[in-house]
Amino acid sequence: MSPAELRSRFGIAMQNDFLYAGTIEDNIRFGRDIPHEQIVHAAAMAQAHGFISALDDGYDHKLTVKGTNLSGGQKQRLLIARALAGNPDILVLDDASSALDYKTDAALRKALREEAEAQKDATATTTVIVAQRVSSIKHADLILVMDQGAVIGCGTHDELNETCSVYREIAESQMGGAILE
């Protein structure tokens, strides 16, 4: 497999990735041959379609360099849409939803779960989520807890609540003292 083919199998959205001057559609397409309908689907999954559609020129809306004419949450949704648009085999979300409010983050997680359930076959995407919010990862099949670069816990949300004090403390602090259920 060539390096280009390997790279094409990944979709990566990072917390502070780059948006360039150009249209929203071109920023999501990112130089790839992706039809408009697929871009709209990716934007809908990323919870970006609503705000894009509300713009006068929609997907043709011009962005400034680094997307300074968007909010932090809007930028992150476009970056997630970019990662999803290529239908990756492996999706990496590296703190990519940190600027999203809890409602939008929950809607994004729901859309990703529904897409995964619809693809319960060999075409399903493996998703790797790097997150600081327990709510962003609590439904994951496997959670790795890291401390200073070392894995200190591994399991499901329920398993880690029982076996990993660091995970439990984080979950309790984020939920006002109550363990996430």
Label every model-predicted segment:
Residues 4, 10-15, 128:
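ABC nucleotide-binding domain signature
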Residues 7, 25-65, 109-117, 124, ...:
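ABC ATPase nucleotide-binding domain helical subdomain, centered on the C-loop/LSGGQ "ABC signature"
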Residues 16-35, 70, 137:
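Conserved catalytic motifs of ABC-family nucleotide-binding domains
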Residues 45, 53-58, 103, 118-124, ...:
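C-terminal portion of ABC ATPase nucleotide-binding domains
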Residues 80, 130:
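Hydrophobic anchor residue at the start of the ABC signature
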Residues 85-89:
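A short, proline-enriched helix->beta-strand linker immediately N-terminal to the Walker B motif
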Residues 91-94:
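Catalytic Walker B motif of ABC-type/P-loop ATPase nucleotide-binding domains
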